């Protein structure tokens, strides 16, 4: 098995050369990159040529972000059950959705992965290789194809426990460990398989997670469901790496997180600490600075994965574009945003998809505030906690009561796009905002509209970005809203 030192050495040997090379231009002739995230099921249900016709005619799309490795419904499959079906595609939910690798799996590229790579082949569409189906037809139209992969797994894959995290109490959890060599070897194998086997233009990978601190505090939308005792990772690989680096003592880390767990559980139950929530949190953090160090340790591991995947792809095909999907939590959590420093990240990024989902952003921010006012910010009423975050994050949107129904404005997209452009200034990295089109929200909450979509796309380009990615997936989008994006591109003469 490849150890961490060899893993980093392999990545570093090609990363330097790759970093010096200029990323390929977004499109010929200086036109903007107009991307669309789309899964295999859409081409199967509607026909490849028909889907490409719709994307080009309605959305002015010139780049496909083809979902090829995921076990999640966020980027693959039809509309999620419980949400209304769009006005195209089969009018039935795919309740038998499975997920996996929608291309051909070539085992020779996967070494020491802990699982059989063949077991990751998606069974949803039989023997169909969606990459071979779509890629030549896209190329014939002058469309680029970037393969879209994410850190979402099934838990019934034989041997998957070898890749999983271990929590505070020694239990296996469903997250994959960022420092696990089996996991890392699988990801670099996936990159090699895709880059050697197909004439692709790029690869994007996303991991919508944070480390133990953010998880324990529930510092994300939907965070009330987080279990502060199941944080990680404390597997043999993480502990060995930490001891080799010598920056923290593992037992001190565990003791600190157990104290944090007590605080979170008491806070969630409504028991106010004598000195309040935030003072108590800082007291724990001061007594156990290892808590913060372990959060950094996790993010360092994630960055090492980025660097290795980037280096592997560029060693095979120097002109391929490699980049990352940056989680929507970047718009909500100051803790998470602090880890998204674009200058060092640019060293292993040809592009960054910065999620700026305006329509669902209001609902998600309200959910985030609901979670963190049950832990760290419990001293504040929800509206005051929201205003505090608005000030910290330079966000100016509506009230806590309003935002689930109004969503965020196009101004949010423009401000975030400008901030990202400034953050990446002087680097080779292109900023491509992720634009929300019909991402599911709760009943009666804000829904996408053609005008709202048009405004968001225009706002992104007014900020000076070189491209946008229409998200999350074509199979949940209403055609009129997709046309709103295309109208913006054509009106601004960017197509």
Feature roles, as predicted:
Residues 1-15:
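N-terminal secretory signal peptides and thylakoid transit peptides that target proteins
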Residues 21-35:
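C-terminal segment of N-terminal export signals and the immediately downstream linker at the start
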Residues 34-36, 64-66, 145-147, 203-205, ...:
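Hydrophobic faces of well-ordered beta-strands that scaffold small-molecule active sites
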Residues 42-58, 96-136, 186, 301-307, ...:
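Aromatic- and glycine-enriched glycan-recognition loops and surfaces
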Residues 50-72, 197-200, 463-467:
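Catalytic domains of carbohydrate-active enzymes, especially glycoside hydrolases
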Residues 54, 115-124, 128, 151-152, ...:
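Polysaccharide-binding and catalytic clefts of secreted carbohydrate-active enzymes
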Residues 63-123:
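Aromatic-lined carbohydrate-binding/catalytic grooves of carbohydrate-active enzymes
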Residues 349-363, 406-419, 423-487:
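Substrate-binding cleft of secreted/luminal carbohydrate-active enzymes
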